[in-house]
């Protein structure tokens, strides 16, 4: 396909137009008085949201050159969301501020490469200062504050704090849509996986249609059990001890399943069989997790172990097991704390090393099941549109809270970035005049989020920023109440990781845009070059 190429000033001007179109749309949502944006869908009612990354992803511009500028800013927002889970609008505002100021200087004759060096120097100094002024999250109230600010709802903040208290900081917290209008929290203790009993005749509670086993032995294997003789010696020993048994296997079929069911119905002993969770390598890993949690051994050919040779001390144990038709929950596994802790560290390392979002999600699920259980926040609302909007906000709040637990928090409302600017301004020097220009560009951009928050609240952003520059650290403008106060004491805080990621990604994308000298895009199709329309077959030939 034919290409259009633009060079130097023309190229940068087109990219800047795209940057402005996307940023001007997204930045209206920043702060407590931020507005909503309505997004058209191909069918059904439009979405209404104030989530920066959702808006950024939905924007495609007609002009190819402008669209590339917009997509680069969208990447800064997306990357911030991937790393920290929030801060997408802040990243967009910072990118626009650095690009705009940088373009002015490049147009005036400054060297873009020198400016880029200055931007990188100033960003590193700002990030170091952010870490110095960061507070550690230590209490449930602080967790609730972070979540409340991100979601603009005290109710949601308290829900997330409750969830984290119950499942721990490494626990999985999932967000689901509720069928009612209330938003509520439920917690699944212990390890749960989505495999139910192989026969309904194994249930112990006919009203709830579930099987409850107290202090059972747990046989864990990746083999298929078809012949009851393979496990008969083991079953006889369990019957003699008067214990119940949970079998987790690749499958239980042939004569084995009806024999187990018959013994259960006769009251010989209590047994429930379920299929092993997951598939392939993930199944092996999950079986090993269950074995470590319960203090058992996976009976597998990979380890040279056979079912017929299995001893009772190779079985796992748990305080309680509940099996429904869809799920199995193991509570109070008897595994050693040291072995579980070692396994948790191993999974954390795998999470840090993986590049796949899907693998990361599955590893985090495994981590949570070992580390403390699963909490489910069920989001309710009166309409589907409101439900989607609330779900977006709660997801953002949850991500922001995790980020705060990881790296701490700083004063919110853009105050921390201005505090950083006040601390390092004058101390950070570029290695050339152009590099110093780059440093100054970042210093000026650090005030952009505060200006935008104030403007969205109907105030003069320049006046608010000027006032803030002469205030003590952590004193900021609370746009929600129109007051000047200590932001940390007022509970207006941002996760350090979110602020840091927003600044680093904005600086990275802005530096790339400023050093762009040529832009190549698909040329628009010319109507004249299109094939002529086929003749109407109904028209006859004149004779």
Curated annotation (Swiss-Prot):
Cellular component GO terms, alphabetical: cytoplasm
Gene Ontology MF term list: ATP binding; ATP-dependent protein folding chaperone; isomerase activity; unfolded protein binding
Localization, UniProt: Cytoplasm
InterPro entries: Chaperonin_Cpn60_CS (IPR018370), Cpn60/GroEL (IPR001844), Cpn60/GroEL/TCP-1 (IPR002423), GroEL-like_apical_dom_sf (IPR027409), GROEL-like_equatorial_sf (IPR027413), TCP-1-like_intermed_sf (IPR027410)
Enzyme class: isomerase
Binding-site list for ATP: 29-32, 86-90, 413, 478-480, 494
Pfam families for the chain: Cpn60_TCP1 (PF00118)
A Gene Ontology BP annotation from the UniProt entry: protein refolding
Primary localization class, coarse: cytoplasm
Keyword set includes Lyase: no
E.C. code: 5.6.1.7
Record flagged with keyword Cytoplasm: yes
Reactions catalysed: ATP + H2O + a folded polypeptide = ADP + phosphate + an unfolded polypeptide
Keywords linked to the UniProt accession: ATP-binding, Chaperone, Cytoplasm, Isomerase, Nucleotide-binding
Entry superkingdom: Bacteria
Gene3D superfamilies reported for this sequence: GroEL, GroEL-like equatorial domain, TCP-1-like chaperonin intermediate domain
Assigned protein family: Belongs to the chaperonin (HSP60) family.
NCBIfam families, alphabetized: GroEL, PRK00013.1, PRK12849.1, PRK12850.1, PRK12851.1
Described purpose of this protein according to its UniProt entry: Together with its co-chaperonin GroES, plays an essential role in assisting protein folding. The GroEL-GroES system forms a nano-cage that allows encapsulation of the non-native substrate proteins and provides a physical environment optimized to promote and accelerate protein folding.
The protein's assembly and partners: Forms a cylinder of 14 subunits composed of two heptameric rings stacked back-to-back. Interacts with the co-chaperonin GroES.
Name of the protein described by the UniProt record: Chaperonin GroEL
């Amino acid at each position: 396909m034919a290409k259009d190429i633009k060079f130097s000033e023309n190229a940068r001007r087109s990219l800047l137009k795209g940057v402005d179109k996307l940023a001007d749309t997204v930045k209206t949502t920043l702060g407590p008085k931020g507005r909503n944006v309505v997004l058209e869908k191909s069918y059904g009612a439009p979405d209404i949201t104030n989530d920066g990354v959702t808006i950024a992803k939905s924007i495609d511009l007609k002009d190819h050159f402008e669209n590339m500028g917009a997509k680069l800013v969208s990447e800064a927002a997306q990357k911030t969301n991937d790393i920290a889970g929030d801060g997408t609008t802040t990243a967009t505002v910072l990118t626009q501020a650095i690009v705009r100021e940088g373009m002015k200087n490049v147009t005036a004759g400054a060297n873009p490469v020198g400016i880029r060096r200055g931007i990188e120097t100033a960003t590193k100094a700002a990030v170091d200062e952010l870490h110095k002024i960061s507070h550690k999250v230590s209490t449930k109230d602080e967790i609730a504050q972070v979540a409340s600010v991100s979601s603009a709802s005290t109710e949601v903040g308290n829900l997330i704090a409750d969830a984290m208290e119950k499942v721990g900081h490494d626990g999985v917290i999932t967000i689901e849509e509720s069928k009612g209008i209330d938003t509520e929290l439920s917690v699944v203790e212990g390890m749960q996986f989505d495999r139910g009993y192989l026969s309904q005749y194994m249930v112990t509670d006919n009203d709830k249609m579930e099987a409850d086993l107290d202090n059972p032995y747990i046989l864990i294997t990746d083999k298929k059990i078809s012949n009851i003789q393979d496990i008969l010696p083991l079953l006889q020993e369990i019957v003699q001890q008067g214990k119940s048994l949970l079998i987790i296997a690749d499958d239980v079929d042939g004569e084995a399943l009806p024999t187990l069911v018959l013994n259960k119905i006769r009251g010989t002993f209590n047994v429930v069989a379920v299929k092993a969770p997951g598939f392939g390598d993930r199944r092996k890993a999950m079986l090993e997790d269950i074995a470590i949690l319960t203090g058992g051994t996976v009976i597998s050919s990979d380890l040279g172990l056979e079912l017929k040779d299995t001893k009772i001390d190779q079985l796992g144990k748990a305080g309680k097991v509940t099996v429904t038709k869809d799920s199995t929950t193991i509570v109070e596994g008897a595994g050693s704390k040291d072995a579980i802790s070692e396994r948790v560290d191993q999974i954390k390392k795998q999470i840090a090393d993986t590049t796949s979002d899907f693998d990361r999600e599955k590893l985090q699920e495994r981590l949570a099941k070992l580390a403390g259980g699963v909490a489910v926040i069920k989001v309710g609302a009166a309409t589907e549109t409101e439900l989607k909007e609330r779900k977006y906000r709660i997801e953002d709040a949850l991500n922001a809270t995790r980020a705060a637990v990881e790296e701490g928090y700083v004063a919110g409302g853009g105050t921390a970035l201005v505090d950083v600017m006040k601390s390092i301004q004058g101390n950070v020097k570029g290695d050339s005049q152009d590099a110093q220009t780059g440093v100054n560009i970042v210093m000026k951009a650090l005030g952009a989020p505060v200006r935008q928050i104030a403007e969205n609240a109907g105030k003069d952003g320049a006046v608010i920023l000027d006032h803030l520059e002469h205030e003590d650290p952590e004193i900021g403008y609370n746009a929600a109440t129109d007051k000047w106060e200590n932001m940390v004491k007022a509970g207006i805080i941002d996760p350090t990781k979110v602020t840091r990621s927003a600044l680093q990604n904005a600086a990275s994308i802005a530096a790339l845009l400023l050093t762009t000298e040529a832009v190549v895009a698909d040329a628009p199709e010319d109507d004249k070059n299109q094939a002529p329309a086929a003749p109407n077959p109904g028209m006859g030939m004149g004779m």
